[in-house]
Each structure stands twice: as C-alpha cells, then as structure tokens.
Curated annotation (Swiss-Prot):
Single GO MF annotation: nuclease activity
Chief location category: cytoplasm
Protein name: Putative pre-16S rRNA nuclease
Signal peptide: none
Function in brief: Could be a nuclease involved in processing of the 5'-end of pre-16S rRNA.
Residues forming coiled coils: none
Similarity section: Belongs to the YqgF nuclease family.
Keyword Endoplasmic reticulum: no
C-alpha cells in the first residue's frame, strides 16, 4: 500500500450476489464501516463500470470481498462466483483483495436494519449494502484483535 499504512487504509467491501452487489466503505484507523450503495449486477460490463466509478470516487487502498459459505464452513454455489469476482477486481484494478467469511452477514444485516426501523422497500434496497457493512466490520474487528495480541 503506497503512502498509507494498513492502519489508516480506506477500504471498500463487497457482498457479491447474482442480482445485486452490496458495497460498504470503511476506515482501518477508525475501525468504522458504513453501508454505501447497492450495484445492480446486470452484466460484467455494467458491474465493473459501477465498481470503477466507486474506486475513482473513494480511492480505497484495499478491497474486501465476502466469501459465502454453508453454516458448517463448506463452500456452496456462490463461493466460487464471489472468488472469481474478487480475483477480477484484483486483476482489473490492481488493488489487494482480502476474503472474509460472510456466514450470517445477511442475518446480521437484516437484524440491524430491523433495529433501526428500516422497513419495506427501503430495507430490501439497503440489505445488500448493509451485509457488506457487516462483512467489513468483521474484517476491521479482526484487525484490532490482531493488534492486541
């Protein structure tokens, strides 16, 4: 990471889905993450143009991609698609990609939106971005755990 240490890095996180990709932004120094936007996953061209626009706007130092798994930790259908997406991000944009186990991120995201009384269409629209926020927060929490050991 040129110019920025891992401790003060700006990060973008992605919750990859066949129809929608949730995006969150966070900062390793403040250990905070927030839901940013949901990209409609229409096709490869649309997907990477939208991601490229976000990278130009936010200029992250690294990317985090949620890796979907079954509750027992075994891969499922979306695992390989999410891996391919992360590898394509790395190849196209030259930014380091870290994988985060995203088991239960959607459940946590749903609960978080419910707690904040986000309802109906707004909840549906924000769910994937909120899941990306949960994924990124897990990553940031792991960073601080490592620093205290």
């Amino acid at each position: 990471m040129s110019g920025a240490s891992a401790r003060d890095a700006t990060l973008l996180a992605f919750d990859y889905g066949e129809k929608r990709i949730g995006v969150a932004i966070g900062n390793a120094l403040t250990r905070s993450a927030r839901a940013l936007v949901v990209i409609q996953n229409l096709n490869r061209e649309h997907r990477f143009k939208a991601v490229g626009d976000l990278l130009a706007e936010w200029r992250p130092d690294a990317l985090v991609v949620g890796l979907p798994m079954h509750p027992d930790g075994t891969p499922h259908d979306m695992t390989q698609q999410a891996k391919r997406f992360g590898n394509q991000l790395n190849g196209r944009f030259g930014l380091p990609v870290t994988w985060v186990d995203e088991r239960y991120s959607s459940v946590e995201a749903e609960a978080g939106l419910r707690e904040r009384n986000v309802r109906g269409r707004a909840r549906t629209d924000m769910l994937d971005a909120e899941a990306a926020r949960v994924i990124l927060q897990q990553y940031l929490d792991q960073l601080s755990d490592h620093e205290h050991h």
